[in-house]
C-alpha cells in the first residue's frame, strides 16, 4: 500500500533529477535510467507517474512555468496599489527570479523552446507562457497608454526580457540582474508618460 503523500514527494524528486540531468548532459542525452538513478528510484517509478520520458519532460516544464507564474504573481500581489511602472518592474523581476535564471532552469528552458517546435504539447505550454507574459505587460502598460501603444510597448518589453535572458543563457554566465533591471527600467520609463 503506498504511503500517503509519496506521490508529490516522488514527483518532486523526479522533476529535480530531470533538471539536474538536463543541466549536466542536455535534454536529448538525459535518459530515464540516469534520471531514475539521480532520484534514487527505479525506472518503473517514472513510468508509473509520467508514462515515459516525454511525460516527465512535460511535467518538468509545467513545473518551471508554474514557478515563473508564481514568481510574477507574488511580486504583483505585493503591489496591489502599485503604479504601472512598479508593477511592470515586478513582472520583469519575476521573469528574472532565481527559479528562472539558475543554470538548470536556463538549460531546461532552451531545450524546451527547441523541442516545442516539434512536440505539440510542449508547443502549447510555450504558447501559454508567452501569451501570459505579453498579456501581463500589455495590461500594465494599458493603465497609462492607449491600446495600440500599450500593445507595442508590451511586445517590446517582452522581447527585451527574452533577449536579455537568452543572451545570459547562451553566454554560460549568470544573468547580470543589475544590468537587466536597468535596461528594462529604462525601456519602461521611455514608454510611460511622464507626470
Curated annotation (Swiss-Prot):
- Keyword set for this entry? DNA-binding, Repressor, Transcription, Transcription regulation
Residues in the DNA-binding region annotation: 31-50
Q: Which PANTHER family match?
A: HTH-TYPE TRANSCRIPTIONAL REGULATOR BETI, HTH-TYPE TRANSCRIPTIONAL REGULATOR RUTR
The phenotype of cells or organisms lacking this gene is: In cells lacking this gene, expression of the bet promoters is stimulated by osmotic stress but not by choline.
Q: In which pathway does it act?
A: Amine and polyamine biosynthesis; betaine biosynthesis via choline pathway [regulation]
* Domain of life of the organism encoding this protein: Bacteria
Q: What is this protein called?
A: HTH-type transcriptional regulator BetI
Q: Taking every annotated instance into account, which residue ranges of this chain make up the domain HTH tetR-type? A: 8-68
Check the record and name the InterPro entries matching this protein. Answer: BetI_C, DNA-bd_HTH_TetR-type_CS, Homeodomain-like_sf, HTH-type_TetR-like_transc_reg, HTH_TetR, Tet_transcr_reg_TetR-rel_C_sf, Tscrpt_rep_BetI
Q: Which residues form a coiled coil?
A: none
Q: Which organism is it from?
A: Escherichia coli (strain K12)
- GO MF terms, alphabetically ordered: DNA binding; DNA-binding transcription factor activity; transcription cis-regulatory region binding
What does the UniProt induction comment state?
Answer: Negatively autoregulated.
Give the protein's function: Repressor involved in the biosynthesis of the osmoprotectant glycine betaine. It represses transcription of the choline transporter BetT and the genes of BetAB involved in the synthesis of glycine betaine.
> Where is the organism placed in the taxonomic lineage, from the top?
Bacteria, Pseudomonadati, Pseudomonadota, Gammaproteobacteria, Enterobacterales
Q: Per the record, a Pfam family?
A: TetR_N
Q: Name one GO biological process term.
A: response to osmotic stress
UniProt keyword Ribosomal protein, yes or no: no
Any extra detail in the entry? BetI is an unusual repressor because it remains bound to DNA during induction.
Amino acid at each position: 500500500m503506498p504511503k500517503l503523500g509519496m506521490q508529490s514527494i516522488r514527483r518532486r524528486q523526479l522533476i529535480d533529477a530531470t533538471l539536474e540531468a538536463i543541466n549536466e548532459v542536455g535534454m536529448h542525452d538525459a535518459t530515464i535510467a540516469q534520471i531514475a538513478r539521480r532520484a534514487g528510484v527505479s525506472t518503473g517509478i517514472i513510468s508509473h507517474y509520467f508514462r515515459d520520458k516525454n511525460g516527465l519532460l512535460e511535467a518538468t516544464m509545467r513545473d518551471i512555468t508554474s514557478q515563473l507564474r508564481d514568481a510574477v504573481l507574488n511580486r504583483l500581489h505585493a503591489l496591489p496599489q502599485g503604479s504601472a511602472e512598479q508593477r511592470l518592474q515586478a513582472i520583469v523581476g519575476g521573469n528574472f527570479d532565481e527559479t528562472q535564471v539558475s543554470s538548470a532552469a536556463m538549460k531546461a528552458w532552451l531545450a524546451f523552446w527547441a523541442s516545442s517546435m516539434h512536440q505539440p504539447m510542449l508547443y502549447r505550454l510555450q504558447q501559454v507562457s508567452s501569451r501570459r507574459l505579453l498579456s501581463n505587460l500589455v495590461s500594465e502598460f494599458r493603465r497609462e497608454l492607449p491600446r495600440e501603444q500599450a500593445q507595442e510597448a508590451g511586445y517590446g518589453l517582452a522581447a527585451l526580457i527574452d533577449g536579455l535572458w537568452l543572451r545570459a543563457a547562451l553566454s554560460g554566465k549568470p544573468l547580470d540582474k543589475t544590468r537587466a533591471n536597468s535596461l528594462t527600467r529604462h525601456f519602461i520609463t521611455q514608454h510611460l508618460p511622464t507626470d
